[in-house]
């Protein structure tokens, strides 16, 4: 834990199917996730997946470790008073892209092959939602749309492409 823990400025949750991910924006504007929940969304079941999750990142998404290392030791205090380890925005995209790339190269471990379809669907949904967000920001439309429009768009896109596994993700 660092001497001065980053302060949470904004807090909310993202839904990926039936999984809720706590997300935060820190006072310095850095956005990200609660690491434990991010690891759970990817498929880790233990309560404190720390070192196992980092080994997984090193294998699947080594590029994510460089910016993850800058913040991975940051302990944040959530609005409910609990503390959590911060995982920066971009980790989810790096992981799903890493799984897809490993699969295409034939290097994905057999026990992780089940991750390919959900990761592909998450990646596409994130890309399309990001594209919509950029257009909304450029046009000013984000001030006119419902506050949960992007979350609903993401859910819709994910469910359209993932009906066979959506109960897990």
Where are the regions a protein language model picked out?
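Positively charged, aromatic-accented nucleic-acid-binding surfaces
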Residues: 1-169
């Amino acid at each position: 834990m660092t001497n001065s823990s980053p302060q949470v400025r904004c807090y909310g949750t993202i839904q990926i199917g039936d999984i809720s991910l706590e997300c935060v924006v820190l006072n310095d504007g850095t956005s990200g996730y609660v690491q434990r929940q991010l690891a759970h969304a990817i498929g880790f079941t233990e309560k404190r997946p720390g070192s196992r999750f980092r080994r997984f990142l090193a294998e699947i998404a080594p590029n994510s470790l460089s910016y993850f290392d800058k913040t991975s030791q940051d302990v944040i205090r959530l609005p409910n008073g609990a503390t959590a380890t911060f995982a920066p925005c971009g980790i989810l995209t790096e992981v799903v892209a890493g799984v897809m790339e490993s699969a295409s190269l034939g290097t994905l471990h057999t026990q992780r092959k089940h991750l390919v379809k959900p990761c592909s669907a998450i990646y596409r949904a994130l890309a399309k939602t990001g594209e919509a967000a950029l257009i909304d920001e450029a046009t000013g439309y984000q001030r006119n749309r419902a506050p949960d429009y992007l979350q609903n768009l993401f859910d819709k896109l994910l469910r359209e492409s993932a009906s066979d596994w959506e109960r897990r993700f």
